[in-house]
C-alpha cells in the first residue's frame, strides 16, 4: 500500500471518527450552537453605534390580518441612548431582537389604543425585558384610561410563568419584583392640548388626542429631544 493510499485511509478514518463522536454528542453540540446563537443575538446592540440624538425604527407595520411577511404595529424610538416602544403588535419583540435593538434595555412602552394588534406582543416583550435586563421594577406601560385593565390582564395571564421562571433561574436573573409590567395611566387630553408623561435628561414625551372611532380613547405621542421631534399617531 503506497503512501498516498495510506493518507487517504487515514483521512477517511479521521472523518469517520469525527462523525461518530459528533453524532454521540449531538445533543450537547446542538445546545451549544443554540447558546452561541442566542448570545450573539442578544449581545447585538445597534444603539451603541448610534450618535446622541433622536432615532426611529419600524419594528412592525402590519394589520390585524395574519401575514407571513408582516408584524403587528410597533415603532421604536431611541433618545439619549434609551429605548422606548410605541405599540407592541405580534412578532414585534422578535423583530427588535433581529434588528439589534436591545429589548432587555427597554425603558417603557406607550400604547396608542387597545385594538388587539397593538397590544398582543406586550406579554412577550415584558418577559424578554424581565429575563434579559437588569431592572428592579416592572416595565412601565403608558396608556390612556383603560391601560390598567390591559396591563393587569397580561400580568395575570403570565403570573404562573413568572413563578416557574423565577424558581428555575433565581433572583439573579428573574427577580419577581421586576416581573411583568406596571400601568401608567393618564386621561386623554382635550383636542389641541397635550399631557406630559416623561421629562428625563432632555427627553420629553407628550400624549395628544386622536380620532379613531369607534375606538375610545385613542392617543398619539410626541417625542422631543435636542430640538428634534417625532410624532406617532397610531392608526
Where do the language-model regions lie?
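Binuclear metal-dependent hydrolase catalytic cores
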Residues: 2-230
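Short, intrinsically disordered, charge-balanced linker/junction segments flanking boundaries
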Residues: 232-235
Amino acid at each position: 500500500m503506497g503512501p498516498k493510499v495510506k493518507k487517504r485511509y487515514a483521512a477517511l478514518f479521521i472523518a469517520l471518527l469525527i462523525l461518530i463522536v459528533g453524532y454521540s454528542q449531538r445533543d450537547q453540540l446542538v445546545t451549544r450552537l443554540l447558546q452561541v446563537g442566542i448570545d450573539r443575538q442578544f449581545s447585538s446592540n445597534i444603539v451603541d453605534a448610534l450618535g446622541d440624538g433622536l432615532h426611529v425604527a419600524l419594528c412592525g407595520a402590519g394589520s390585524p390580518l395574519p401575514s407571513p411577511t408582516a408584524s403587528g404595529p410597533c415603532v421604536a424610538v431611541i433618545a439619549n441612548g434609551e429605548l422606548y416602544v410605541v405599540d407592541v403588535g405580534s412578532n414585534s419583540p422578535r423583530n427588535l431582537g433581529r434588528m439589534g435593538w436591545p429589548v432587555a434595555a427597554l425603558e417603557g412602552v406607550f400604547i396608542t389604543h387597545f385594538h388587539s394588534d397593538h397590544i398582543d406582543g406586550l406579554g412577550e416583550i415584558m418577559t424578554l425585558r424581565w429575563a434579559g435586563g437588569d431592572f428592579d421594577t416592572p416595565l412601565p406601560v403608558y396608556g390612556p384610561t383603560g391601560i390598567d385593565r390591559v396591563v393587569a390582564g397580561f400580568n395575570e395571564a403570565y403570573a404562573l410563568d413568572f413563578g416557574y421562571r423565577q424558581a428555575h433561574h433565581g433572583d439573579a436573573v428573574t427577580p419577581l419584583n421586576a416581573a411583568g409590567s406596571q400601568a401608567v395611566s393618564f386621561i386623554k387630553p382635550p383636542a389641541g392640548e397635550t399631557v406630559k408623561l416623561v421629562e428625563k435628561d432632555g427627553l420629553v414625551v407628550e400624549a395628544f388626542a386622536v380620532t379613531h372611532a369607534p375606538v375610545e380613547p385613542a392617543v398619539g405621542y410626541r417625542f422631543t429631544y435636542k430640538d428634534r421631534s417625532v410624532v406617532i399617531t397610531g392608526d
